[in-house]
Amino acid sequence: MAYLRSSFVFFLLAFVTYTYAATFEVRNNCPYTVWAASTPIGGGRRLDRGQTWVINAPRGTKMARIWGRTNCNFDGDGRGSCQTGDCGGVLQCTGWGKPPNTLAEYALDQFSNLDFWDISLVDGFNIPMTFAPTNPSGGKCHAIHCTANINGECPGSLRVPGGCNNPCTTFGGQQYCCTQGPCGPTDLSRFFKQRCPDAYSYPQDDPTSTFTCPSGSTNYRVVFCPNGVTSPNFPLEMPSSDEEAK
């Protein structure tokens, strides 16, 4: 009987290890509430200052993203809206958020048994962010940051309430969105790259913006406002909300 119990425990631990390739710890250090979102797994969670949300991601998860929503109001059924990052007016996101929103993107257990991950500003910027492996292994497996005052310095043509749009979102077309083949940086995409060199500033900004870690042995942490401060042009106080059962 003891052998059976030991075998069952071993099987259970092996199953959990096999099922989940990585854990993502999402923390809000902003001096305001952030409604974190995660797709295709996780959904959404209200995070007041100092709160953390843990997401377990299965092997093979790809085209995944984590972002923060701001200035949200949800009712008891989880329906409402957000000023930035809104995902169809629901607390539990199943689709991508509406720009502008700073993105932590990842794909697990891909080529050569590597996780691929990045911070992207292709959908614009709303909240400062750090994205980091909790156990960095050197090379391209290290913390990356986008903590500049982008909202405060945003060009007038890209400025919107609560954030700063990417030129692809604002203007569209080949020049900014690379819709019909290769394209390069523009003056507007360089605005983002100069302030956040780790992050994607336009869709084909891969060489300096894609990071990798060994799959299955790396967990990650996403922190909103890692410095504990926010851009001057962003409101420090958000409207109260009655939504969400945590």
From Swiss-Prot:
Belongs to the thaumatin family. The gene is TPM-1. Its EC number is 3.2.1.6. Its main location: other. This is Osmotin-like protein TPM-1. Keywords: Antimicrobial, Disulfide bond, Fungicide, Glycosidase, Hydrolase, Pathogenesis-related protein, Plant defense, Signal, Vacuole. Antifungal protein that inhibits the growth of several phytopathogenic fungi (e.g. Trichothecium roseum, Fusarium oxysporum, Phytophthora citrophthora and Colletotrichum coccodes). May bind to beta-glucans and have beta-1,3-D-glucanase activity. InterPro entries: Osmotin/thaumatin-like_sf (IPR037176), Thaumatin (IPR001938), Thaumatin_CS (IPR017949). Disulfide bonds join 30-225, 72-82, 87-93, 141-213, 146-196, 154-164, 168-177, 178-183. Residues 1-21 form the signal peptide. GO terms for biological process: antifungal innate immune response; defense response; defense response to fungus; killing of cells of another organism; response to ethylene; response to jasmonic acid; response to virus. Coiled coil: none annotated. It is found in: Vacuole. One of its GO terms (molecular function) is beta-glucanase activity. Induction: By viroid infection (tomato planta macho virus TPMV). Triggered by ethylene. Accumulates in response to jasmonic acid (JA) and acibenzolar-S-methyl (ASM) treatments.
